[in-house]
């Protein structure tokens, strides 16, 4: 994982700008500084833009996402937390012995944006530990402008919670590899004048005409913690079954509460109520996963999957184009029939998802009678199928 590798792979996925991640770590800062500086908070390498971002864990194991306007702001934040963290120089996501109020207050001091990371996951998210934003951020709650939804949630899930209606929803994915399966599994499209920190900040705050215009992400059923399930054997349970079992699986291991069940507990409404500013949400499944399923591969990381992925990207430019916009007759000239058929199934909303849970990702299935597979609408709410329409 290097900034250089990310800068090359991002455009092949169709991404213009990435958060650097880990910008409080000295070694990673050196990587970032190999980029050309566009302004204090924006950097570029191989045509890909970067803004300074980091994730920190507080003393309740809640993860917070930060965006910094400059290296000096990031350094000032690092200086403020260094006596409260034992792994600031050894871990990209440091553990900080401070609470959400303190971390948000320090962010405000350096004019950084801060909000909950992967807000609903059962181990290290705000709603795993807290019942509300106020419980976490206290008198700093008005300063919180966004929540990152995480892979196991979407706009429909989150907009059942009234206190989130004022926030901007970010659909990001904290890639641990520049491999196309992991990079930009989710992303947010913004209406901005330029791809810079200041313009992105305005878009997150929804000021000056800047705003998010599209959230793109996995179907939440594909997330590792969508349903309540055992963390060892991955047997799925309803909330009622898990509670009766006192969250202990028949195999003896722990049942972990799923995002769907947790949101059901804290929801204000049974059905989502979207505020006027909320943009559409489009579901995408990584092209590598679709190729793997079409080829009968057990993993999208095989050489044969990568070869077919590379052929399609070479022909059409980016993964998004292949999935949504490329003419299927042209796709058929580039790849094997099974892959063309699978892409057609995706576009026709016929791909099905076996939900994830307990730490195991959900899996996609091509049209099947399997009772465990549930059909998921994989297009925008208004049935437009091209991201270019946004």
Residue ranges: model-predicted function:
Residues 291-390:
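Low-complexity, acidic/Ser/Thr- and charged residue-rich accessory regions of DNA metabolism proteins
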Residues 166-182:
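Short acidic/histidine-rich active-site segments
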Residues 23, 119, 151, 173-175:
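Active-site metal-binding loops of divalent metal-dependent hydrolases
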Residues 1-59, 351-352, 364, 373, ...:
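An N-terminally biased module of ancient metal coordination in phosphate/nucleic-acid-related enzymes
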Residues 209-282:
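Cys/His-rich short segments
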Residues 29-145:
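Extended substrate/RNA-proximal surfaces in nucleic-acid metabolism proteins
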Residues 22, 66, 114, 147, ...:
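Divalent metal-coordination and catalytic microenvironments
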């Amino acid at each position: 994982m290097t900034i250089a590798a990310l800068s090359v792979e991002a455009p092949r996925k169709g991404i213009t700008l990435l958060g650097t991640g880990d910008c409080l770590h000295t070694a990673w800062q050196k990587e970032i500084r190999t980029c050309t500086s566009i302004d204090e908070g924006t950097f570029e390498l191989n045509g890909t833009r970067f803004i300074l971002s980091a994730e920190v864990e507080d003393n309740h194991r809640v993860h917070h996402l930060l965006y910094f306007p400059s290296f000096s702001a990031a350094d000032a934040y690092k200086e403020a937390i260094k006596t409260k963290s034992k792994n600031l120089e050894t871990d990209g996501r440091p553990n900080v012995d401070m609470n959400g109020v303190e971390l948000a207050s320090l962010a405000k001091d350096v004019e950084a944006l801060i909000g909950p990371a992967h807000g609903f996951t059962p181990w290290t998210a705000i709603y795993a530990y807290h019942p509300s934003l106020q419980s976490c951020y206290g008198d700093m709650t008005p300063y919180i402008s966004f929540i990152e939804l995480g892979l196991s949630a979407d706009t429909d899930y989150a907009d059942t919670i009234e206190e989130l209606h004022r926030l901007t929803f970010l659909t990001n994915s904290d890639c641990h590899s520049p491999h196309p399966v992991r990079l930009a599994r989710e992303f947010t499209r913004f209406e901005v004048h330029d791809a810079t920190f200041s313009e992105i900040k305005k878009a997150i705050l929804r000021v000056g005409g800047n705003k998010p215009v599209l959230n793109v992400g996995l179907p939440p059923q594909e997330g590792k913690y969508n349903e309540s399930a055992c963390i060892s054997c991955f047997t799925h349970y309803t909330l009622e079954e898990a509670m009766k079992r006192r969250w202990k699986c028949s195999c003896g291991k722990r049942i972990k509460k799923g995002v769907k069940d947790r949101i059901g507990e804290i929801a204000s409404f049974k059905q989502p109520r979207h505020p006027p500013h909320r943009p559409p949400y489009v579901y995408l499944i990584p092209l590598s996963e679709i190729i793997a399923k079409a080829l009968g591969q057990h993993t999208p990381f095989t050489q044969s999957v990568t070869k077919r992925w590379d052929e399609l990207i070479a022909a059409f430019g980016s993964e998004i184009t292949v999935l949504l916009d490329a003419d299927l007759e042209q796709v058929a000239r580039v790849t094997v029939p099974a892959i063309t058929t699978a892409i057609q199934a995706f576009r026709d909303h016929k791909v099905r998802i076996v939900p994830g849970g307990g730490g195991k990702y959900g899996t996609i299935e091509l049209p099947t009678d399997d009772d465990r597979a549930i059909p998921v609408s994989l297009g925008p709410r208004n049935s437009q199928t091209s991201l270019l329409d946004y």
